[in-house]
């Protein structure tokens, strides 16, 4: 902003013959559909003089202050003003724009001219974007506060850049111009379709949108696809923001880069931030959520999508602002603080990411420039009928760039440790949930979406190279081969995938009355036929506790005592089975009601003497056992880490197996899925000696019946189950027992059971 001493004197000269722009250019400018308004507005030299033009539709007067001299503009028409300066070589100037506010004198606004600044994107940025290879796209598109040193002083403002290649014109609207974009028109840069404008004095925290004059003749007001912050929904404007956050997680980030999460423990609590404890902000969650997951031994938190979404009932899975953490809970820096606090407490952070589809809201990405831009133009590929959403055009370089850069953005700007990619199956198959004749085949006549495959491979290869130690997890519900195979071997390149088969079979089995389970024994053994074909996560996610499916508690047959026993047993089975585990909020203590994003978690169940309290105490203990026993996680992806003891005891409803660690450790796990106690069950073991009972889900501490083995069993050299040794033990009904061998010098503390067996 220019600072003048006293009142600048007015200077008048003979008007230039070039004062008035060509009629066609002027008409396009007035219509808001000029591709290069900078070619008309701003300062332009002609032979021995300079013409400055300004478009200020609501102004009563405009003047340019040059070296202390005030040059008054002539009003040409419809808010277009111009002035002739009798010289060339103009270095700097400021505008004085007068507005009639009803007083004796007009209100004068002093500002730099937006149309005298060079583009804020370089040729290399534009080239990389058009090729789909700009890995830090968020640094060039979107809204960026900038400062320029000029001869007349410092100019502060914000540069705006948006991709809309088929638009006839793009205007910037916001509080700064009372949402009238005529005076703030962007220019297109070359053939890239990127429109750009630097606007002086635009405030950080200011609201804005783009007014797009679409190729279809429709003028629409759009949120910035690259917005880094937004208004709180249901309001839809984008917000200028900048980060001043100082991270304090260097130790975590260094450790992350040196590890492969596939070979590390991962016990994940899945959380919907808005409903975990309704009403909490990011800052409050940083205290309360961190304390909770640390107290109960989880290693990771997985957050349902935090990117901005207009409809809370979508749980975040219909994203409109891919680069903005939801403003419902605070600012982007406050989200950084939440991640930072979790890291400082040793907790990893995974966020759900939704590149498969996006909603059709008229102010968002859909038909952004009047054409199918982000979505595929053919509705047989560009629409997801089940969800009423658009599908990204994965074959378009700029769209792939938008998504790949977005994945990098969350990993690098917010230090998140992983992305759980939603609805991968819907991306991989062209006929996914489509009727016959409602889809088009690929170039080879198949149903595989080759462009989506290429995108997923590119995304995975890029993020793993740029951010070593992060994890990408696919929610992929089919048997697509090689989901977790490296991309250089033809796979999709994910670190892990959800084991939906394990989840479906296990939940079906535990829902049955114990008296019938022996006839469905295969449902619990089948998962081991493919357990090492991919790197798996065992999910009991939000999808399994909504829409009438019930909860873990609700699925269990029997009275409350048996339901609680069943929940404890199931969780112990999940933790012992090869693969990482994920559990949705509330299920860690056996919430009885289905989840509702409007109600949140039923914390009232956590009475110290309740079954829920017992389940949660077991989770806390079990997580501690899990992280301290390498046998439970170091060989999750290898057959070396697993061996059946007996997979075929359907008569007794018992499963048993061994887990091995990369340090030579071993854990014996046995599960009695029947409703009856087995008081003299002989179990084959690798060697004789004392085997400590490290977990008994029926322990009185967990509000179980307290049936057990006095803390340990003695294995003798009697072969059983094909093993050289065996031990006779008590198996409580609906229970899980874990045993580890005890070194001779480590005494076992034996305690009698504290409650009688179930009748």
Curated annotation (Swiss-Prot):
Q: Which Enzyme Commission number(s) are on file for it?
A: 2.4.1.18
Keyword tags = Carbohydrate metabolism, Glycogen biosynthesis, Glycogen metabolism, Glycosyltransferase, Transferase
Named in its record, the pathway it takes part in is:
Glycan biosynthesis; glycogen biosynthesis
The entry's active site is 422, 475
Query: Where do the TM regions start and end?
Result: none
Domain of life of the organism encoding this protein:
Bacteria
Q: Name one GO cellular component term.
A: cytosol
Catalysed transformations (reactions):
Transfers a segment of a (1->4)-alpha-D-glucan chain to a primary hydroxy group in a similar glucan chain
Picking any one GO biological process from the record gives: glycogen biosynthetic process
Q: Which InterPro entries match?
A: A-amylase/branching_C (IPR006048), Branching_enzy (IPR037439), GlgB (IPR006407), GlgB_N (IPR054169), GlgB_N_E_set_prok (IPR044143), Glyco_hydro_13_cat_dom (IPR006047), Glyco_hydro_13_N (IPR004193), Glyco_hydro_b (IPR013780)
Check the record and name the SUPFAM superfamilies matching this protein. (Trans)glycosidases, E set domains, Glycosyl hydrolase domain
User: Molecular function terms in GO for this entry?
Assistant: 1,4-alpha-glucan branching enzyme activity; cation binding; hydrolase activity, hydrolyzing O-glycosyl compounds
Residue ranges, annotated region (Disordered): 1-21
Q: Does the keyword Transferase apply?
A: yes
Task: Return the Pfam families for the record.
Answer: Alpha-amylase, Alpha-amylase_C, CBM_48, GlgB_N
Entry similarity comment: Belongs to the glycosyl hydrolase 13 family. GlgB subfamily.
Spell out the subunit comment: Monomer.
- Sum up the protein's function in the record's words: Catalyzes the formation of the alpha-1,6-glucosidic linkages in glycogen by scission of a 1,4-alpha-linked oligosaccharide from growing alpha-1,4-glucan chains and the subsequent attachment of the oligosaccharide to the alpha-1,6 position.
For this protein, the record's NCBIfam families field holds: branching_enzym (TIGR01515), PRK05402.1 (NF003811), PRK12313.1 (NF008967)
Descriptive protein name: 1,4-alpha-glucan branching enzyme GlgB
- Upper classification of the organism: Bacteria, Bacillati, Actinomycetota, Actinomycetes, Mycobacteriales
